[in-house]
């Protein structure tokens, strides 16, 4: 730690000249009038501050030289929210309203984008609870969230996309993925549950004291959290990221149609790059894998919400051409509010169960083939049986008819500013899954296909262990009463389980 008042003890440094970098933004240059930024020099330094101020002003941001009551956003580097508040209290300037306290990474992202970007948990600076308590004496407050009851089940927690603990959850997601690649299910579940509960917290963990009372954080998990708090990274995660096997499996499984068994085979054969795999004449690829290689660049790029909405319009047009009363619902991450995804899932159902419905997906495929919109498809026939009990496995696949396909999305269907096209291309390959379910099972199918994966796992686990019921994408069965419980909506399923309803955008466990 630097000695107090070190600036008075060290030799005086020549102050940089106040060039245009420190001049206030001129009104004609300001594009974003409602946003007033002040960059804190503490721990950043004069030169870097001046550099960032100039960059931000060039992009049309209003950046103040001095703190004033007009400031709406305070940006700092290597400071906590508590550090910034302490600095603010030492200033004589009265700030009329509480400004946003943000890490410099937010401003850098704004500069790159040329416009204000969304403020998320990773940008917001954290104020220590003990600091806020000591600086605001008064009546007792609600106990910190960490010591309140947090459920071990994701279905009893509200998890939005505002992740305040991304530095930890990213680490556990990597460790869980590595365990999945090694088929170490127990450790995979341990890390997935840890990441899930941390995503639900409305505050950032900044000390080990903050982890007290939080479920799903065993000694190994806490050890990793402590290391990240102290060193800024986990040595175990670093080792995984540098591990040749992990890197190879990550690469191989990015190909549509390639799973763990194939990845293991290729790795044991000595392959480490996709170019070597593709050029090897001894390997035989499935139709799905051939399509995965053929459209690889498009398929590994993210699908934007605008692209997903464009696909949705085309799916509905095709379905309604054959079944006008059908309900077509976008599920998966996009239903949970995500702006990006790797594929687009749709649930299709119709009040009238007819032969037309059974042939629907094949008719849609034929239509798209004629229009040149279909690059690949694999139609899986239904094996659904009405009287079959729900599966006891938390990761069980359903038995509905479904189609896994690669759709050719025309460029003119999407706003160019909202898509991720390769330059010069007039279309993009998009992964799409269509699921056709009986109308009376639509609530169960919708709940299952909305996700997230961990939310669904915990929902099924909760049903089994806490309610003596079995739940899957087809049905809910009460083992005590020995009856199937009917549901017209997701809300009714939650009610059967005795759970508060969790909105789709709160299921990002």
Curated annotation (Swiss-Prot):
Annotated motif Nuclear localization signal, positions: 11-17
Cofactor dependency: Mg(2+)
Entry EC number(s): 2.7.7.31
Stated name of the protein: DNA nucleotidylexotransferase
UniProt modified residues of type Phosphoserine: 134
GO CC entries: cytosol; euchromatin; nuclear matrix; nucleoplasm; nucleus
Chain positions covered by the region annotation Involved in DNA binding: 258-262
InterPro entries according to UniProt: BRCT_dom, BRCT_dom_sf, DNA-dir_DNA_pol_X, DNA_pol-X_BS, DNA_pol_b-like_N, DNA_pol_lambd_fingers_domain, DNA_pol_lamdba_lyase_dom_sf, DNA_Pol_thumb_sf
One GO biological process term: response to ATP
Gene name as annotated: DNTT
Residues that bind a 2'-deoxyribonucleoside 5'-triphosphate: 333-338, 342-345, 448-449
Oligomeric form and interacting partners: Interacts with PRP19 and DNTTIP1. Forms a ternary complex with DNTTIP2 and core histone. Released from this complex by PCNA. Interacts with TRERF1.
């Amino acid at each position: 730690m630097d000695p107090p008042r070190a600036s008075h003890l060290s030799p005086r440094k020549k102050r940089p000249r106040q060039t245009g970098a420190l001049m206030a933004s001129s009104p004609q240059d300001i594009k974003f009038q409602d946003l007033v930024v002040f960059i804190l020099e503490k721990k950043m330094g004069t030169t870097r501050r001046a550099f960032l101020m100039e960059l931000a002003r060039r992009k049309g941001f209003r950046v103040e030289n001095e703190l004033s009551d007009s400031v709406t956003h305070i940006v700092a580097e290597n400071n906590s929210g508590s550090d910034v508040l302490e600095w603010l209290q030492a200033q004589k300037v009265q700030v009329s309203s509480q400004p946003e306290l943000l890490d410099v990474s937010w401003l850098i992202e704004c500069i790159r984008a040329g416009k204000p970007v969304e403020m998320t948990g990773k940008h917001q600076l954290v104020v220590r609870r003990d600091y806020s308590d000591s600086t605001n004496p008064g009546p007792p407050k609600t106990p910190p969230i960490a010591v309140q009851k947090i459920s071990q089940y994701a279905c009893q927690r509200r998890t939005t996309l505002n992740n305040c603990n991304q530095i930890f959850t990213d680490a556990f997601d990597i460790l869980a993925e590595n365990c999945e690649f090694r088929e170490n299910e127990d450790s995979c579940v341990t890390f997935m549950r840890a990441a899930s509960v941390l995503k639900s917290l409305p505050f950032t963990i900044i000390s080990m004291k903050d982890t007290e009372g939080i479920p799903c954080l065993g000694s190994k998990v806490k050890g990793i959290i402590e290391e990240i708090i102290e060193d800024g990274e986990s040595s175990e995660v670093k080792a995984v990221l540098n591990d040749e096997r992990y890197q190879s499996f990550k690469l191989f499984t990015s190909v549509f149609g390639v799973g763990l068994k194939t990845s293991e085979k290729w790795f044991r054969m000595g392959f480490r790059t996709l170019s070597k795999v593709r050029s090897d004449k001894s390997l035989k690829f499935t139709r799905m894998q051939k399509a995965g290689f053929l459209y690889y660049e498009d398929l590994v790029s993210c699908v934007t919400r605008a692209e997903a909405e464009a696909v949705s319009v085309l799916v509905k047009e095709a379905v309604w051409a054959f079944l006008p009363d059908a309900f077509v619902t976008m599920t998966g991450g996009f239903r949970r509010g995500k702006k990006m995804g790797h594929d687009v899932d749709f649930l299709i159902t119709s009040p009238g169960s007819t032969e037309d419905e059974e042939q629907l997906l094949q008719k849609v495929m034929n239509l798209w083939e004629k229009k040149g919109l279909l690059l690949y498809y694999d139609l899986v026939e239904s094996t659904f049986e009405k009287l079959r009990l729900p599966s006891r496995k938390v990761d069980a696949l359903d038995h509905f008819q479904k189609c896994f396909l690669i759709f050719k999305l025309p460029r003119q269907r999407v706003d160019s500013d909202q898509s991720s096209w390769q330059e010069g291309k007039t279309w993009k390959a998009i992964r799409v899954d269509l699921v056709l379910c009986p109308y009376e099972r639509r609530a169960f199918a919708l709940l299952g296909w909305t996700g997230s994966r961990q939310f669904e796992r915990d929902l099924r686990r909760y049903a089994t262990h806490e309610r003596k019921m079995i739940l899957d994408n087809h049905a809910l069965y009460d083992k005590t009463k020995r009856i199937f419980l009917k549901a017209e909506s997701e809300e009714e399923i939650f009610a059967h389980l005795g759970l508060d309803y969790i909105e789709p955008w709160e299921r990002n466990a």
